Amino acid sequence: MVKELLTFEEVSFAYSSSSPVIERLSFTVFENEIVAILAKSGSGKSTLFRLITRLESPDQGTIVCHAQGKIGYMPQQDLLLPWLTILENVSLPLEIQGKDKKEAKIIAASFFNRFGLVGTESLYPDALSGGMRQRAAFLRATLTSETLLLLDEPFASLDSLTKTSMHHWLVSMWEKEKRTLLLVTHDIEEALLLSDRLFIFTNQPLHGFTEVQVPPDLRRKMETTEKMEQQRSSLKKDIRALLIEESLR
């Protein structure tokens, strides 16, 4: 039976006396799925993540989250501290959670092979490529949470070749780790490639949305046939038409 991991029920939120950012928003995210969130800049996506991580509390409605431990967060910029080595950066959240520094490093180091980071332990962030830095940031977020990761346009700043490589890598990691991922992206192709479902927000404040189910035979399939490409192209066309239609209203 598929378990509910995160539920928003009629959630509303506004900063002080300003207009609502989120208004009567309801949705459910299930365990071990990847949900992509498509919305225009400034629409309230960051506020949505702040509510999920409990940095903000809703003015109305309820948020139920069954994630074990803390919630992992990976922003567009890797935010690796330049004066710390990669191992020190990755183990830092474990130290903040109360682990002894030596123990934290041992735990973090045990994941470096799985995440393709062996050999970077003693290097500083400036010595790594953009893709490798994002791997380190993803590992850091993974160690923060056992079940739920929030990814805020994590690959937007990467070139197309590195982004494609990271897509392959993320899928392989998800298949091994089986965590629930919420992915904010402006890239329709990325959303269709990686996710089980898309939440397409076209209004402000965030309220209703269009949900798109990605066909099971298209989800996270890196090697595709002509038929699969046609299916993805058709879905992409429909989503783009929806976004254009709503932007003209």
From Swiss-Prot:
Q: Name one GO cellular component term.
A: plasma membrane
Entry keywords, A to Z? ATP-binding, Cell membrane, Membrane, Nucleotide-binding, Translocase, Transport
Q: Where in the cell is it found?
A: Cell membrane
How is this protein positioned relative to the membrane? Peripheral membrane protein
EC class of this enzyme? Answer: translocase
Predominant location category: membrane
InterPro entries membership: AAA+_ATPase, ABC_transporter-like_ATP-bd, ABC_transporter-like_CS, ABC_transporter_ATP-bind, P-loop_NTPase
Pathway, per record: Cofactor biosynthesis; thiamine diphosphate biosynthesis
Pfam families reported in the protein's UniProt record: ABC_tran
One BP term from GO: thiamine diphosphate biosynthetic process
The superkingdom listed in its UniProt entry is: Bacteria
Quote the record's binding site residues for ATP: 39-46
Single GO term (MF) = ATP binding
Annotated ABC transporter domain residues: 6-228
Protein EC: 7.6.2.-
Summarize subunit and interaction data from the UniProt record for this chain. The complex is likely composed of an ATP-binding protein (ThiZ), a transmembrane protein (ThiX) and a solute-binding protein (ThiY).
Q: Which family does it belong to?
A: Belongs to the ABC transporter superfamily.
Its function? Answer: Participates in a thiamine pyrimidine salvage pathway as part of the ABC transporter complex ThiXYZ involved in the import of thiamine degradation products such as the formylaminopyrimidine N-formyl-4-amino-5-aminomethyl-2-methylpyrimidine (FAMP). Is likely responsible for energy coupling to the transport system.
Q: What is this protein called?
A: Formylaminopyrimidine import ATP-binding protein ThiZ
Source organism: Halalkalibacterium halodurans (strain ATCC BAA-125 / DSM 18197 / FERM 7344 / JCM 9153 / C-125) (Bacillus halodurans)
